[in-house]
Each structure stands twice: as structure tokens, then as C-alpha cells.
């Protein structure tokens, strides 16, 4: 498997994770994880993931090149200077704007903690058996499965989500449109460097396993495999004062 490196400097680098690959090894002791690819790129094999990304999701993951840089970048991320925006396909006709401010549990048996996600609807497709909406989501907090859980709470669960979605809807989208994965992709990333405050980042095109099903549903994507005028949905959200990693 070839993993694309989206950015690299002396402090950090960003890898483009495909759907189906874990960021790091967990209880299931996966044979290969993204950290393995990351360590192969660095002298001495040291790479520290600063962000997580669900196994079924795709898109950029930030790594630090040393333990010291990892501590610095983690603190910087918690202060709100690392941002990702996501494209998601959700059930039903989503409102033009959603502000989901709903506490969620860190663990099944733990207390609820603050969680907030901003959502903007890009387009609606008249798919069968239910209409579907392509949305842009920006999590202002970094809780586990936050976008997936918040969209379920809003009654617009993600298509292809085996945990928080509905199998009776996921199945037709797989059979009719070829969508065989979680419909969640981090399409934009931005990091303000803690040393110089220079901003690095960029857009990340949809992978083919998500791009082609969306086109079959009738969504209009440009030659860069992103929705037309995507930047229009990203710009108005510039760095909310209460944003965190």
C-alpha cells in the first residue's frame, strides 16, 4: 500500500490515511497501521501521531518527528491551532446550517464532556431509498467519533457507519452506488507552527472509493475530486475563538 505524504518539515509531517487503516495498533493487534508507515519515513523510526482518525475515515493525520515535538504540538493542538474540516454523506435532507452542541461520553461508562460540531450542507441528492446530504463538518472539540455521534444525535447519521448508522440504509447505498466504506473524509487541514506561527495546510481530494459513489449519486465534484466552491464553505468559519483540537 502506498501512503501519500502531504507535507513535511523539520518538526512534523502529514500522511494521507486511506479508509480501513488504523492510525495505531489497538486491542485487535492489526498487522499494519499508519504509524508503521510513518516510522519508516523518519530517521531512527520515530513518529508520534498528534491526531487520530477513525479507521473507516480517510484524510490527513499529523505526526511529530520526536517526543519533544510531540509534546509541543499536542499542547498547541489542544489550544486550537490545529484544524481539520470533513466531508460526510449523511441520511436525509440536512438543514443549511447546524450547530450541534451536545455533550458526549469519552467512554461508555464515563461522564459526558463538552462537544460541539459546526455543519454546513453543501448539496442534497435524491437517492433511493432515502435522500442524502453532502455536508462539511468542523469539530470544535476532539471527542472520540464526535462527528459520527453528533450527526446521529441530529437524526442525520453518516452513510456507511456500522456503529452509529443504520444497516438497512447502508446496504442499499453499497449495492446501488458502490459505497462500501464510511462516508467521512478529512478534506482540509491547517496547522499554525508553534515556533514561527507560520500557517501550513491544504485541501485533500476525495479518494476514489468515495468520489465515484458520490458522482453516481449525482453530486457535482470538480476535477480535483472535491465539491465545487468548497472553499466558500470553509472560509466563513475562520478560527472560532472557542475551537480546540
Where are these regions (language model features)?
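RNA pseudouridine synthases
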Residues: 1-129, 172, 203-245
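Pseudouridine synthase
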Residues: 30-34, 38, 67, 129-191, ...
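Glycine-rich GHKL/ HATPase_c ATP-binding element in histidine kinases
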Residues: 84, 133, 182, 198-200
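Short, structured patches in soluble enzyme cores that scaffold and shape functional sites
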Residues: 90-92, 121-123, 137-139, 160, ...
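Short acidic, glycine-rich loop/turn motifs
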Residues: 106-108, 141, 191-199
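Short, solvent-exposed loop/turn segments that connect beta-strands within catalytic domains
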Residues: 126-131, 194-198
